[in-house]
Structure formats: C-alpha cells, structure tokens
C-alpha cells in the first residue's frame, strides 16, 4: 500500500491517494500483475468523492481512480469545521463511528477516514473504525454515513417543527 500527499489542482479540488494494491493473475508464462488505486477528492468545503481505478500500471490506475472520484462527488452539510451530529455506518464488516468534536481537537481518525476528512474540509472530528480496516470498505462505510448527515433545519422541516424544538 502506498500513500501520497494532497494535490490541489487548478480548479481547487484536492486529491489524496488512499491505497494502491497489486493483484496477480497466473498465466502459462508466469504472472501478470495488475494494480488498483483508491483516491478521494474534495473541494475543502463539504464536497467529497471517492474513486477506484484498475490498470496494468500504477499511474494509469491512479488516473482512473482520480477521474472516478471527481465524477462521483457528494455534498455534505458541515457545521463550521466539524459534523452536525454523530453517525454510525456499516459496509461489509467495516463499521465506522464519526463524532463531531470541539474546536482545536483536530482530525482523530484512521488513515482512510483521515484522507476523506482532510479533502472535505473537516478540521475537528473523532472517528473510529470497528471491525475490518480494509481501506475500500472503510471509505464506502464513511460515505454511507456522510450521506446520512442532516442539518437541524432539514430535520425540523421533515418533522414539521421549529428549529428551536429540534436543537434543544
């Protein structure tokens, strides 16, 4: 597994390489290697996406993953530099728990989740991965959780109540 730093492109989207895997196919003449790359991309203001790319060469796999990440971005409502509420989500046997944190806490999370929060613009969060720590499953579980994020305004509108009643 390899890691790379955050790269910012001209359009302001940050990209971070989370994992690179090597696979081998055994053929008559020996082994043929392939690579898969997992990349997260975000604008630093609540938009984030992830992509998986596969190719025979590492740079090609990273390029494909980056394109997929940019194509599949979601918008997550943030509360300043943290989350609105605690979230628990599961994908396969990876369960992630994300909690909002007070100012100055920083990003306390595992490698795969840390990359997501950094490119998304979250600066204060507590996150824990329970069960499998497979980076692909952790990223998918994190995205499932982030899709569940709701603002107090949207919760109040769904319940037909005033925001003051919800925030209590």
Swiss-Prot record:
<keyword id="KW-0687">Ribonucleoprotein</keyword>
<keyword id="KW-0689">Ribosomal protein</keyword>
<comment type="function">
    <text>With S4 and S12 plays an important role in translational accuracy.</text>
</comment>
<dbReference type="GO" id="GO:0006412">
    <property type="term" value="P:translation"/>
</dbReference>
<comment type="similarity">
    <text>Belongs to the universal ribosomal protein uS5 family.</text>
</comment>
<dbReference type="GO" id="GO:0019843">
    <property type="term" value="F:rRNA binding"/>
</dbReference>
<dbReference type="InterPro" id="IPR014721">
    <property type="entry name" value="Ribsml_uS5_D2-typ_fold_subgr"/>
</dbReference>
<dbReference type="InterPro" id="IPR018192">
    <property type="entry name" value="Ribosomal_uS5_N_CS"/>
</dbReference>
<comment type="function">
    <text>Located at the back of the 30S subunit body where it stabilizes the conformation of the head with respect to the body.</text>
</comment>
<dbReference type="GO" id="GO:0015935">
    <property type="term" value="C:small ribosomal subunit"/>
</dbReference>
<dbReference type="Pfam" id="PF03719">
    <property type="entry name" value="Ribosomal_S5_C"/>
</dbReference>
<feature type="domain" description="S5 DRBM">
    <location>
        <begin position="13"/>
        <end position="76"/>
    </location>
</feature>
<dbReference type="Pfam" id="PF00333">
    <property type="entry name" value="Ribosomal_S5"/>
</dbReference>
<dbReference type="InterPro" id="IPR020568">
    <property type="entry name" value="Ribosomal_Su5_D2-typ_SF"/>
</dbReference>
<keyword id="KW-0699">rRNA-binding</keyword>
<protein>
    <recommendedName>
        <fullName>Small ribosomal subunit protein uS5</fullName>
    </recommendedName>
</protein>
<dbReference type="InterPro" id="IPR013810">
    <property type="entry name" value="Ribosomal_uS5_N"/>
</dbReference>
<dbReference type="InterPro" id="IPR005712">
    <property type="entry name" value="Ribosomal_uS5_bac-type"/>
</dbReference>
<keyword id="KW-0694">RNA-binding</keyword>
<dbReference type="InterPro" id="IPR005324">
    <property type="entry name" value="Ribosomal_uS5_C"/>
</dbReference>
<dbReference type="GO" id="GO:0003735">
    <property type="term" value="F:structural constituent of ribosome"/>
</dbReference>
<dbReference type="InterPro" id="IPR000851">
    <property type="entry name" value="Ribosomal_uS5"/>
</dbReference>
<comment type="subunit">
    <text>Part of the 30S ribosomal subunit. Contacts proteins S4 and S8.</text>
</comment>
């Amino acid at each position: 597994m390899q890691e790379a730093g955050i790269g910012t492109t001209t359009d302001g989207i940050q990209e971070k390489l989370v994992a690179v895997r090597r696979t081998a196919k055994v053929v008559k003449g020996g082994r043929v290697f392939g690579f898969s790359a997992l990349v997260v991309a975000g604008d630093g203001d609540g938009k984030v996406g992830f992509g998986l790319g596969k190719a025979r060469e590492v740079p090609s796999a990273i390029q494909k993953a980056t394109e997929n990440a940019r194509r599949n971005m979601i918008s997550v409502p943030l509360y300043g530099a943290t989350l609105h509420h605690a979230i628990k989500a599961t994908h396969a046997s990876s369960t992630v728990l994300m909690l909002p944190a007070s100012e100055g806490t920083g990003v306390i999370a595992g490698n795969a989740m840390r990359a997501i929060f950094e490119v998304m613009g979250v600066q204060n969060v507590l996150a824990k991965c329970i069960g499998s720590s497979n980076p692909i499953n952790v990223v998918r579980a994190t995205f499932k959780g982030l899709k569940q994020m709701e603002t107090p305004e949207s919760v109040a509108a769904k319940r037909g109540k005033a925001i003051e009643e919800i925030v209590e």
